[in-house]
Amino acid sequence: MDHAIWLPYCQMKTARPPEHVVRSEGVMLHLADGRQLIDGIASWWTACHGYNHPKIVDAICQQAREMSHVMLGGLIHQPATHLADRLSRMIPGHDNRVFFCDSGSVAVEVALKMASQHWINQEIVGKNRFVCFQNSYHGDTAGAMSICDPVDSMHSHFKGFLLEQFPTTIPKSEQEFKAFKDFLLERRDQVAGVIIEPLIQMAAGLRFHSVASLKGIANLCRELGFILILDEVATGFGRTGSMFAFEQANLKPDIVCVGKGLSGGSVGLAATIATQSVYRPFHTDSWDHALMHGPTYMGNPIACAAANASLDLFEKEPRLEQVQMLEMWLSGYLEPLKAHPRVVDVRCKGAVGAVQLEEDVPLQSAIDFFVDRGCWLRPLRDVIYVAPSFTIERPQIETLCSAIREYVDTQ
């Protein structure tokens, strides 16, 4: 490759040359050679309003002229305080606290540290491990890797230095919930919290679980006194049809991790939001009780300005209604593929449509196939999926879904 970039999730020696993007607008990627691609995955599910939305661009430019960055160590600024207040009010509870960071993985790391230290600060020792779930993905930093699926994740090379956690399956039936409760009780003195991606495990191949399962897990956490951490990095900000996925189960989580769509897909930004009950043991006269974590660029003013503009758009534009329409379109175009002999399942929810095949999709040749048809799609193992910007129009959805149907028919 004729560049020095080490690309993510990529065997650099054998990978197809990356497409060179020179401009993005709406749902379109404009390439250096003049071609255009419909982006069907919104840059890993971030660009919820489409690329280069003028409201977000204006907010970024204005903030860059006033103050591009200042540390949050002993200093604060209006974009961060305004955003923190808004995020705090979006999560159930009174006086929630918002810790800013720069990626979803770090938001998860912070959540794990909050949950562990919550018990340490109360002199409750040994509660420093986490219950997580099969097929889960929470990020690529060390703590986040430790709570990903231990067998079927991308992190098998790193088992030697990862903390051992308590993975299990997401319960569905009454019998499975009884077994899950026993599982929790057996580890009660070791578990700091339970972490789950609500409703959709996105990076695991867009695997869905029910509102009933999510409610049942949350109820057991409440009953047994476990901290419930919801990883809404991928599912938050409208992706599943509600502002946050947990709203569909009417939950009151203890900690929520957000990212991706937080800034409307414009600037890297994430946050970990904790309830007052989690925060209280940190708020003492002891320095030892302070949370010792601080990303250099946490709460960057430009990123916070972008996020505030994005939240303004959610308030002023019919984004959730657009997501509901997207679900109808995706279901209409993709559900007929259930009858195809190569298709195992078709799943649609909110702004997500997934077609699961009998075997893994060869990534490089599949990307070639879709690029030749003017589409940017990037399959996940045995799943070809669409998770676009919420502003995408029906003809563009039809083009993406037609390309998927053609791929399933011909490959």
Spans of features found by a protein language model:
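Conserved N-terminal phosphate-binding loop of PLP-dependent enzymes in the Aspartate aminotransferase
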Residues: 1-411
